[in-house]
Amino acid sequence: MPARSAPPPPALPPALRRRLRDLERDEDSLSEKETLQEKLRLTRGFLRAEVQRRLSALDADVRCRELSEERYLAKVKALLRRELAAENGDAAKLFSRASNGCAGNGEEEWERGGRGEDGAMEVEEAAASSSSSSSSSSSSSSSSSSSSSLLPAPRARKARRSRSNGESKKSPASSRVTRSSGRQPTILSVFSKGSTKRKSEEVNGAVKPEVSAEKDEEEEEELEEKEQDEKRIKIETKEGSEIKDEITQVKTSTPAKTTPPKCVDCRQYLDDPDLKFFQGDPDDALEEPEMLTDERLSIFDANEDGFESYEDLPQHKVTSFSVYDKRGHLCPFDTGLIERNIELYFSGAVKPIYDDNPCLDGGVRAKKLGPINAWWITGFDGGEKALIGFTTAFADYILMEPSEEYAPIFALMQEKIYMSKIVVEFLQNNRDVSYEDLLNKIETTVPPVGLNFNRFTEDSLLRHAQFVVEQVESYDEAGDSDEPPVLITPCMRDLIKLAGVTLGKRRAVRRQAIRHPTRIDKDKGPTKATTTKLVYLIFDTFFSEQIEKDEREDDKENAMKRRRCGVCEVCQQPECGKCKACQNMVKFGGSGRSKQACLQRRCPNLAVREADEDEEVDDNIPEMPSPKKMLQGRKKKQNKSRISWVGEPIKSDGKKDFYQRVCIDSETLEVGDCVSVSPDDPTKPLYLARVTAMWEDSSGQMFHAHWFCPGSDTVLGATSDPLELFLVDECEDMQLSYIHGKVNVIYKPPSENWAMEGGLDMEIKMVEDDGRTYFYQMWYDQEYARFETPPRAQPMEDNKYKFCLSCARLDEVRHKEIPKVAEPLDEGDGKMFYAMATKNGVQYRVGDSVYLLPEAFSFSMKPASPAKRPKKEAVDEDLYPEHYRKYSEYIKGSNLDAPDPYRVGRIKEIFCHIRTNGKPNEADIKLRIWKFYRPENTHKSMKATYHADINLLYWSDEETTVDFCAVQGRCTVVYGEDLTESIQDYSAGGLDRFYFLEAYNAKTKSFEDPPNHARSSGNKGKGKGKGKGKGKGKSSTTCEQSEPEPTELKLPKLRTLDVFSGCGGLSEGFHQAGVSETLWAIEMWEPAAQAFRLNNPGTTVFTEDCNVLLKLVMSGEKTNSLGQKLPQKGDVEMLCGGPPCQGFSGMNRFNSRTYSKFKNSLVVSFLSYCDYYRPRFFLLENVRNFVSFKRSMVLKLTLRCLVRMGYQCTFGVLQAGQYGVAQTRRRAIVLAAAPGEKLPMFPEPLHVFAPRACQLSVVVDDKKFVSNITRTYSGPFRTITVRDTMSDLPEIRNGASALEISYNGEPQSWFQRQIRGSQYQPILRDHICKDMSALVAARMRHIPLAPGSDWRDLPNIEVRLSDGTSTRKLRYTHHEKKNGRSSSGALRGVCSCAEGKPCDPADRQFNTLIPWCLPHTGNRHNHWAGLYGRLEWDGFFSTTVTNPEPMGKQGRVLHPEQHRVVSVRECARSQGFPDTYRLFGNILDKHRQVGNAVPPPLAKAIGLEIRACVGARMREESGAAVAPPAPEKMEMTAAAD
C-alpha cells in the first residue's frame, strides 16, 4: 500500500479530498495523462475563469491537431503550476466561490453533483473487482480516446485505466512523504506526479514552487518556439500568395470556434443540457450473480434441471430500467456503442419471465447489470408489440418499462422500432410507392398506446433512417433469392440518399440481432394479366430468343461493369457455402451455371446504384444526326452476273432507253418486281428494294430501286418481325449487276372485318419463311418514327414505265418547302411586288397577320429588363452556415431563361429585289410589315401582361422589313369592336386568335385609338401602297373568320373508354376539345373513382381490376358482379389511359424474371384491351421515362403489338408547360389510329417555356427521334407563371381545412378568368393544405421570401415551437474536407464522414432548424437544392407530385409568400384543372388524385389534333365541308362538357 500524500487544502470540499485520495491509491494503474485528466476534471470547476479559458483553447488546439499530445500535457502542467506559484501558494484565489463568498455553497454543489449523481457509481468503480469488466475496459478505451476530447468537462466520470502512453512509473513509497517545510500543501501537490527527478527534489525540499513555475514557463516557451519554427518552415516552402492565405487562416481560426467536448464513452456532448446522470441504485440492489440466484426469480422446483445445457442463458424481464456508461451518463444503447465495445450497464427491477406486470412488485432490485453484450428485437410478427432485449454474460433480459429518468431516451428507441415496423409492413404490399407516399403513411399512422409521443413525423423517419433501412435489409435477407429486394424500391432509395444511410452493416458483426425473425407473407402484386392471343404470342413466344440473348449480354456486362462496391461489410465477408447460390458454385462442387453471388454477399450499394441508374434519363441527350436517310449506310457489292434485256425498249428519251424486262443469270425481272441487293459486309442481311424503272445509258445497264426498310432498322429494332418490311421515302439509281436475286414482297392490307377480329386466335406469322418471301403493311417515317398506312398514288399513263412513289413524295415535300411568290402586282423602286407568297404549303397574302421569330425585329420602346437576381451580399456565416452552398445561379422553376413569344406583324407588302438582269430575285423574298406590340413590349413591361388577356395586342404604325424565312405561321388579328360576338367567344373559337382595341405610340408612351387602315378590314383601296387595300380585303380577318361557320356536317363525339382513369384529367381535356364522350372508365382506387363520378355523372365507372373486367368481356359476359353494363366489341371508338409501369421499371435490362413481370404488367393488359376492342383511336400516356425503360424495350414492344394489330402508330414526348400550365411535366405519348383513319400529329406548343425543360427528343438504339413539332424555340403566347395561376386565392394558414370558402376578390389574370369559369355563385373548394409538424412549420416560417430561397437560407438558431418545445442549434463538429472552413474559421462538417472517415451514428443530431441530414449528404446530391424551397411568383411549379413535402422529390412546394405548403386547389390549378372540378376524399387523397392526373390542357391539345383527323376523314369520305376543330376555349373551359 503506497503512503498517502499530504491532505489537500481545506478550501476543497471534503468529498473532493476523498476522491483525490482514492485517485492517489490507484496511481499505479494510471498513466501520467490519465492522472492529469482525472485530477483536472475534479478541480476544474474551482479554477478561475481565465485559467479555464486557456485550458479550453488548448483543448481546441489538440482537437484540431494543431498541438501534439506531448506539448499539450506539458502546457497544461506549466499553466497550472504558474498560476499556483503566482499566488505564492495561496490556493484560495484559484477557486471561484459563490457570489456571497461562502465556500459552503460550492461544497454542497459538489456533494450534489458528485455524490448525488455519481456517488453510487463511485463505490462500484472503487471496488472494480470484476475481471471481465476490467479486461474489456482496457481493450475498448483506445478505440474511443482518439476521437474524443482529451480532457472532459467536470461532471464526466472517471477516465479509462488503460496505460495508453506507458510513461507513468510507480514511484517508491518513500518519495511520497509530507513536505518537511511545514507549510500547508496547495493544489500544486495534487499535480506533482511529474518526473522521478522532480519528486526526489521535493523530498529534499530543494525546489520551491516559484522556481518550479519559472522552470516550467521556460519549458513552455521552448515548446512554443519549436512549434513556431515548425510552422515557419511549412509556410516558407509555399508560394507568396499561399503564405498570405495561411496567415489569414491562422488569424481567423479563433479559439471561439472550438468543438464542444464529448464524453469519451457515450459520445454525448458534455455541455448538452439534456445530458443526464444515473441517479444511483437503492441500498438493497444486488449484484448480477447474486440477483440471479434469488429465489423470487427461480421458475424451477428443486427436483427439476434448470437448463437443457450450460450454454443456455436464463431469461428474465427487467422493469424500471436505466442504461448508462461507466461515467454514469444515461445513454441510448442503439447508437453503435455496444458494437464498438463501449461498456454499457443497466439497473432496474428484474422479474421472472412469466410476469407481465411492469410495476416494481415482485421484482428483485439489481445494480450495474452487464456490461451489455448484445441487444435484440423480437415479436416482429405483425402484432402490435415489438420486444427489445439485452444479453449479458449471465442472462437474457426482456425490457418492460423504463425508469422515469430513462423514459425520454427509451421513447426514441420505441419510436424507431414502430417506425421500421410501419415501413416494412407498408412496403410488403406497396413496392412502387414514392418517398412522399411513405411519408403519408407514416404521418397518418397512430402510434400505439402508452408511448410518450402522439404522431410520427418526417423528422422522426430521417432520425431513424439508418435503423429502418437496416430492418429492410434484414427483411430482404429473409426473402427468396429471386425476389427483387425491397431496398431498391423508389421510396427506400430516396430515403437512403436523403438521410445518408450506410448500407451493408452486417448483423453478425454488429451486436444487434433480430431474434427469430418472422417472415411476413409478401403481397403477390396485381392479378395475372389478361391478354388476347395475339398479344400473348408476341410476348411469350416471339421473343424467347431475344431474352436469352439479352441474358447472355447481361452476363458479359456483369463481368465487365457490374462491380460490387467492395467497401461495405457485406462485400468483405466470405461466401457462406450453404445457400443455393454457393452450392451452385464450382468451388463448392456445383455446376457454376447460375452465376449468382452468395446470398450473404449481395451488395446493397450495387443494387441501389443500379436501380438509380435505371431511373435516371439524361436530359442532355447527346447530339446525334436525325436518321433522315439510311441510304448512306448501304454499301453494296457488285455480282458477276450475265445480264441481257428481254424485248425492245418501251420508251426512249434520247439519252436513256427504258425496258420492261431483264434476264439476270437465267432469272427474268420485270418493272415492279422486288429484288435483293448484296451488302458490302457479308455479315449483314440483304438489302431489299422494288424495281421501279430499268434503262440503259452511258453508265451501263441501270435500274431505279425504291428501298424497303427492314423492321430491325426502324424504331422497333430487334422486336420487329424478321419478315416484315416497311415502305420508306428512299430510292436510288444503280447498276443491275448489284442485284443478288428476285424476292417476293407481299402487301398485307387490313381485312374487311378488321375491327371485329380483335381477340380472336390468330396466327402470329403473316407469311411462311422460305428465305425469299417478305411482307409489308405500313409506310415508315424515319425522322418522326411514324408507322402509317402506305400512301396511295396512281401514276400517270405517260410516266408509268418510270414512276417511283418515293420520288413523287420527295418532290412534293421539296416543292412545299421552297418559298415562292405568286400573283405579281407592280414594280417600283427596284422591287417587284406580289399579292401572295407560299411556304410549307401555307399561303400568305397582303393583309394577313403572321408569326415571326423573336429576333425578326425589335421594338423602339425598350421595356425594363426582367429583374435579374440581386448580387450576392456578404452573409453572416455563423448565423447562416449553409448559405455557402448556394454558388449556382440556376434556380429550378425560374423563367429567367424563358424565350420571348413570337413577334406578330401584319403584312403590308410582299416583294423581291430586282437583279441587274432585270429579273426579280425570287430566292430572297421580303415582307414589309406593321408591328404589333404585346403588353410586355410597351413601357408598362411585365406588370401590364399579368392583368391583360394573353391574346391582347396593340396596333402600331411602326413598319419594318423582314425576311420571309422568319415567318413561322399565320394567325388572326382583329379589331375588338369590329367583332359581332364577344371577345371571349371569339378567342375560344379557334387557335391563333388575337385582338386589339388600342394602338400604341412608343414615342409618346401613350395608347391611342387605332387608325382606320388598321381597323377597317373591309375598306378596300384605302391608304397608300399597291394593292394593299385589296389585300386587306382578303385578310385573315375575312377569310379565316368565314371558316368556323358551321356547315351541314357535325363531328360526332367518339365513344371513349378511359382505363386507369384516375380522377379524370385525360377525359376532361378530351371533353374540352369536344372530341370524345367518356361512357366508361376503369379506376381501382376508390377515392379517384368517386372523383371521376362527381365530374362525369353519365359515365359508368368500374372500380375493379381491369384484368378481371377484360376476362369477363372476353368470356361473353354482359355485366359485372355489380350489374354494371360492360362495353362490348364495336362499342369503343377511343381507348385512352396511363397504365402504371412501376412493376418493371426497376431494372434496365430484361432477364427471364423481369421479363415475366413485364408480361404480367398493366401495359400488356392495356394493349390487350386495344386488341380486343379495336378502337378507332388509341392513346397511351406515361412518364417521360417510359420511352427509355429497359433500353427502350417497353416502348418497342408496345409499338410492335400495335403494328401487328394493324394500327398506324407513333410516339413522342410533350411538355405540359408548353400548353398553358405553370408546371414542368414531360409526358410520353403513344398515339395509334385504326386502318383508314388519319394518324394524328402531335400538337404544336402554344406557350413558350423554360428551354431546360423542353428537351423532348428521344434516343433509341443510338438513333435520335423527334416528334413533328416545329415550334421548338418559341410559341404564340408567353409562359404561364405561378402568379398567373394562384395570386387571386385568399390567404390561408398551415393546416387550413375549410373545404369551401369564398374567393374574396375578382380574378386578376387571364388564366384565372379561364380557370374560374362562369359560376353563378362562385365557391372556392379544396383550398386546404397539409398540417405540418411544429418543427417543419418553424422551418417554413424561417425560409426567406426572396426567389430561390430554400433550406440553405435557414438560420442556425434555437426557436420555440408551437407545441411548446424548443429546437436546438445544429453543431458543426468536424472539419469538412471538401468545403473547408467558413470565413469566420468555423467548422462545416456535421459527421465524421466529412473528414473522409465512416459515418458515426453518435454524430446524428435532431430537432434542429437546419435538418442535420441535408448538410450530412449535401455534397453528394447537388446540395439538395430546392428542398424547403419557395415557389417563385414569376416561375413555375416542379412536376406536381402526389404529396407535397418540403423534403420530397418535388422540392419547391412552399407558397411564395405564406408559411405553408401549396394547397390542393393550387396544385389542381398548376395541372390546369378548372376550379369547378371536384375532388374526393381526405387531403392526401386529393393531392394524390391531382398529382397522378394528366393536365387537362395537354389532353385538350391532343384531343384537338384527334378531332382534326376525324374531320379530315369525314371530308374525304363525304366530299362536303365539315366544321373544323371545334369551339375551343383559349386554354381550358370551366367545367366538363
Swiss-Prot record:
Catalyses which reaction(s): a 2'-deoxycytidine in DNA + S-adenosyl-L-methionine = a 5-methyl-2'-deoxycytidine in DNA + S-adenosyl-L-homocysteine + H(+)
Annotated spans, Disordered: 1-34, 97-232, 614-638, 1006-1050, 1518-1537
InterPro entries per record: BAH_dom, BAH_sf, C5-Methyltransferase, C5_DNA_meth_AS, C5_MeTfrase, C5_meth_CS, Cytosine_MeTrfase1_RFD, DMAP1-bd
Compositional bias of kind Pro residues: 1-13
Effect of residue 190 to H: No loss of interaction with PCNA
Biased composition annotated in UniProt, kind: Basic and acidic residues: 21-34
Binding site for Zn(2+) 2: 576, 579, 582, 598
Acidic residues composition bias: residue spans: 215-227
Residues covered by region (Interaction with PCNA): 182-194
Tissues in which the protein is found: Testis and lung.
GO cellular component, one term: nucleus
GO molecular function: DNA (cytosine-5-)-methyltransferase activity; DNA binding; promoter-specific chromatin binding; zinc ion binding
Biased composition, class Basic residues, residue ranges: 1021-1033
Major location (coarse): nucleus
Site (Important for activity): 420
Record-given protein name: DNA (cytosine-5)-methyltransferase 1
Gene from which this protein is expressed: DNMT1
